[in-house]
Amino acid sequence: QIPVLSGYAEHAFDSEYALKDASFTVVDPLQKSSTIKADNALKSVTVFDLLLPTDGTYKISSKVNYPIKYALHNKVWKPFYEVSAQDAGELAKRDYVIADDFPKNQPPSFQEIQREWTLESYVTKNKVSTLNAKNDAPIQVSFSVHPNQIKVNQAVQLNVSKSGKPLKNAQVKF
């Protein structure tokens, strides 16, 4: 078995917040699916033990969402955060707005959305195996090589699609 750690992070491998009420789907090398509910009280990371009884690749996935409040500022919708002006700094240097960015006599128009993430990770025990599991994420990403065989300085082609059709102008960040 191995520990699986996940969380919200601005920088890779530096989790800041645990995933609340996260449920993980695990597809084993034999294509059997199971669900794991992480049960921990940590604030910075969500942790669970993953049993690896069979050699091959395990796909771990989860869907999480988080409500985000947007405010209309100068005809542009921007994320709205409850932060003091002192902590936020200059408006020109940030991509969000706070209450102090609006005139006192003109409350902002708000809109709340649910931001949803589909998280996927792959763990391989001893040897890689074919990934056959159906992907029901709104946006699918497939690799030209097995995800656990990607190496530093190796070119990898990604296919990004939505509803089975190529997604035009997709932006990918690593």
Explain the meaning of each model-derived region.
Residues 1-2, 91-156, 161-168:
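Beta-strand-rich domain onsets/edges
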Residues 55-57:
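Extracellular Ig-like/FN3 beta-sandwich strand-entry sites
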Residues 17-20, 164-174:
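Short, ordered, surface-exposed loop/turn motifs in non-cytosolic proteins
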Residues 24-34, 171-174:
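Short amphipathic beta-strand segments in non-cytosolic proteins
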Residues 35-42:
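Short beta-strand segments within Ig-like beta-sandwich modules, predominantly Fibronectin type-III
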Residues 64-75:
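Short acidic/polar inter-strand loop motif in beta-rich domains
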Residues 45-52:
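Exposed aromatic-hydrophobic patches
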